[in-house]
Amino acid sequence: MMENNRNYFVAIALSVLILIAWQFFYVSPKMEKDRIAAEKAQQAQSQPGTQQAAPGQAAPGQALPGGAIPSAAESRDQAIGKSARVAIDTPALSGSINLTGARFDDLKLKGYRETVDPKSPVITLFSPAETADGYFTEIGYIGSDATGSVPGPQTVWMLSGGDKLTPSTPVTLSYTNDKGITFTRTISVDDRYMFEVVDSIKNDAAAAVSLSSYGRVTRFNKPSTPSIYVLHEGFVGVAGEHGLQEVGYSDVEDEEPVEPGKSTGGWLGITDKYWAATIVPPQDTPFDIRFSHFADGRPRYQSDYKSDAVTVAPGQSAEVKNLIFAGAKEVPVVDNYELTYSIPNFDKLIDWGWFYFITKPMFKMMDFFFRLFGNFGIAILITTIVVKLIFFPLANKQYASMANMKKVQPKMEELKKKFGDDRMGLQQAMMQLYKEEKINPLAGCWPILIQIPVFFALYKVIYVTIEMRHAPFFGWIQDLSAPDPTTIINLFGLLPFEGPAFLHLGIWPIVMGVTMFLQMRMNPTPPDPTQAMLFTWMPVVFTFMLASFPAGLVIYWAWNNTLSILQQGIIMKRQGVKVELFDNLKSLFSKKPKPAE
């Protein structure tokens, strides 16, 4: 027994060392690397000077017309105030369109704030290029000598219709070049996050002209929050037959641009955890998508497309329609846009992960219960009950097998006495006993293994869906997508200091650890010392692991463990087997070391 106790302490020591090593060798260096990269980007942005390419012509190293690349020397208000603009005002958005380039570079999300504090600033999505957080989208054209000057980054559009963009009042912009080609742009917006940009091109020149449309989403910085491998942030799109494209920022920083190939149908953009900016090009014209990074002047990331040329005969007109999505990745809204505008796989804008076939239905289930009860925490609890009911037949079979194992416990003890130190003989005899009694020795692990896909699916739902952002539960849990804010290190706020982040253990992670420990003690202790040690210390390791996970996930895990304990107890009683939870606990804490010989 003293040897077993020593093994227990070795196991817990190793577990803590692993957590410390993970923090020291991986998390801390990664955060430092991100910090240094952000500082370098900030320094590069603050360098004075601009680079200029001619309107309608490709800048060096670019396939699209370039514009001025200004230094990040102005405040947001200064940058917005120096240019002519048309206001945007919808139930979900506020901002303006810059008439120079018809650029969407001023956009805020009315319904979302930076923190749970209702007085905190609303989320800013787009900002002008002259600011440190420059982020914008624009639509333009690539022409030739025959077309003359075509709309590009430096084109000054004239506001020819409407004075404010609202869901009920579109605006019209116009531009006529020296060749007699008139571009009339009508911009409309719905009550959420979708803009329609429809260009009418009238050719009053003497000859036919050919020109290609382009669109780009440009960002002068990466998100300041550390990236998480379970979630994709960066370039995203669907390139026709080439399918879903997910390209990280680092994938293009030191490499060539990523170009999936010519496509018909699809979309492209840049996505964050909760927000996105995308362009849906004309779906009936082939186009090329590109994801790239430019280090000239100020480093910037760009997701763009260029369509095949469209020819407009003399005296004729052509129409080019683009869609721009800019806003929150709300699941019902994104799904509705996919259906309404026939955008292929637009729901993939939300990173549902490998278990898409589980994750999205689970969200829909939780969303249904949320609308019914008005609390996502309660929705998680009820969804867990539904999942338990779905898996009940299989769980019933597994728990019944475990109950049968308890019945043969006396026979197992006899085999231990019979074979003594003959471990090989004992294992063979045990396997024969399992076969005769039709027992699966791994039945105790199966309930945990079964829920792993569901666990990851729920983790995805809680982590990536904006509906969980700032969603309260009860008491101190005001954001189910964030970790439990309490910590045992300072006695849950009673002491005026904070311990190391990797040692933070909130109330809910501790509750989860206790329920997991009790669930493990519902099962017979494995005869193998290594397995027994694993069963003993697994709850401790999981408690530390889940301490930094979203509170909603930890609540789910604790509640699921509680339901599993009740389910297993009921099944064992039905099988006529004594529930030995309290006996196992009493035995665990009353064991005494053997006296030294």
From Swiss-Prot:
Keyword annotations of the record: Cell inner membrane, Cell membrane, Chaperone, Membrane, Protein transport, Transmembrane, Transmembrane helix, Transport
Segments for region (Disordered): 38-75
Subcellular location: Cell inner membrane
BP terms from Gene Ontology: protein insertion into membrane; protein transport
Signal peptide per UniProt: none
Membrane topology: Multi-pass membrane protein
CDD domains reported for this sequence: 5TM_YidC_Alb3 (cd20070), EcYidC-like_peri (cd19961)
GO MF annotation, one: membrane insertase activity
Keyword check for Isomerase: no
Low complexity composition-biased segments: 41-70
Subunit structure: Interacts with the Sec translocase complex via SecD. Specifically interacts with transmembrane segments of nascent integral membrane proteins during membrane integration.
Biological role: Required for the insertion and/or proper folding and/or complex formation of integral membrane proteins into the membrane. Involved in integration of membrane proteins that insert both dependently and independently of the Sec translocase complex, as well as at least some lipoproteins. Aids folding of multispanning membrane proteins.
NCBIfam families per record: PRK01318.1-4, yidC_nterm, yidC_oxa1_cterm
Name of this chain's protein: Membrane protein insertase YidC
Species name: Sinorhizobium medicae (strain WSM419) (Ensifer medicae)
